[in-house]
Amino acid sequence: MMTYLSKQFSKLLFGQLLFLFIGNLLLKPVQAYPIYAQQAYANPREVTGRIVCANCHLAQKAIELEVPNSVLPNQEFEATVKIDYDLNQKQLLGNGQKGGLNVGAVLILPEGFRLSPNSRSPFFNTYSEQLPNVIVIGPVPGEKYREIHFPLKAPDPTTNKQVHFVKYSIYAGGNRGRGQLYPNGQKSNNAPVLASVNGVIEQIRENEVVIKTDQGDLVSQAIPAGHTLLVKQGQKIQNEQPLTMDPNVGGFGQAEKEIVLQNPTRLKTFIAFCVTVFIGQLAFVLKKKQVERVQASEMN
């Protein structure tokens, strides 16, 4: 009896360990799906002003960035990145099937500006420990996040000497859909297949095209699932000529806006000055009216 129970316990323990091991393997790709730029670039903005996401998302699609014109120290405010696209469009997924578009965004803030500590969204992350002023999000479902609202907090120059009461620039980048390249230069299946040689289409199979070169050699090129062929058997083709239609329906865009970190003392002084000028003008008008009445009474 004890032997039987021991065997059953061993089977149960082995099953649980196997489940955990397989589950861990399956979960790793999900957990290891960060913004690819974080893995390949120390800074998301190049010296030319180009945001590095454009190196993998080759198509260009505009985005909009909305921020307040000015903020006060320690003020919490919101920046909105609008990533618009046709919801009826479907993108080519990694498995060759069609699915909805995902979106992602990066917001590059001035030094000292941070993600609001009151933000409860699990999707926002800082780009790195060295760049806490750069906020990233994605990939997230495009149907829900065509507008991404970043909750932010302005710095206080009285406590942070690296910050000043001046005008700053805020940069944003946003993409919809999958990229065409990986950071290592490898193409994804979300890009057209180009001919690697000159020649003639010798044969078309289910997942490959065989090209007969001008020298008589046969070159086979794989065609990912979900692609639509543009060529037919017997057709003469050139090197780098598209063999399939471009499956990409997404694209990347970037925008820039300016924001002023206002000095409260200067703002109060300006308001006091405006009030003083208004009172002075009002007193002048009243005095003028009084003089006119006196002159009118003397004439009568």
Swiss-Prot record:
Q: Which InterPro entries does its entry note?
A: Cyt-f_TM, Cyt_f, Cyt_f_lg_dom, Cyt_f_lg_dom_sf, Rudment_hybrid_motif
KW Membrane (keyword) present: yes
Where is the chain membrane-spanning? 267-287
**GO-annotated cellular components:** chloroplast thylakoid membrane
A biological process from GO: photosynthesis
- What does the entry list as the binding residues for heme? Y33, C53, C56, H57
Q: Name one GO molecular function term.
A: iron ion binding
Q: Which residue positions does the secretion signal occupy?
A: 1-32
Subcellular compartments: Plastid, Chloroplast thylakoid membrane
Q: Which UniProt keywords apply?
A: Chloroplast, Electron transport, Heme, Iron, Membrane, Metal-binding, Photosynthesis, Plastid, Signal, Thylakoid, Transmembrane, Transmembrane helix, Transport
Question: Which superkingdom?
Answer: Eukaryota
The record gives the membrane topology as: Single-pass membrane protein
List, separated by semicolons, the cofactors it needs. Answer: heme
Q: Which PROSITE patterns match?
A: CYTF (PS51010)
SUPFAM superfamilies (UniProt xref): Cytochrome f subunit of the cytochrome b6f complex, transmembrane anchor, Cytochrome f, large domain, Rudiment single hybrid motif
How the cofactor binds, per note? Binds 1 heme group covalently.
**Any coiled-coil regions, as ranges:** none
The similarity annotation says: Belongs to the cytochrome f family.
Complex and partners: The 4 large subunits of the cytochrome b6-f complex are cytochrome b6, subunit IV (17 kDa polypeptide, petD), cytochrome f and the Rieske protein, while the 4 small subunits are PetG, PetL, PetM and PetN. The complex functions as a dimer.
Stated role: Component of the cytochrome b6-f complex, which mediates electron transfer between photosystem II (PSII) and photosystem I (PSI), cyclic electron flow around PSI, and state transitions.
Official protein name in the record:
Cytochrome f
Q: Which gene encodes it?
A: petA
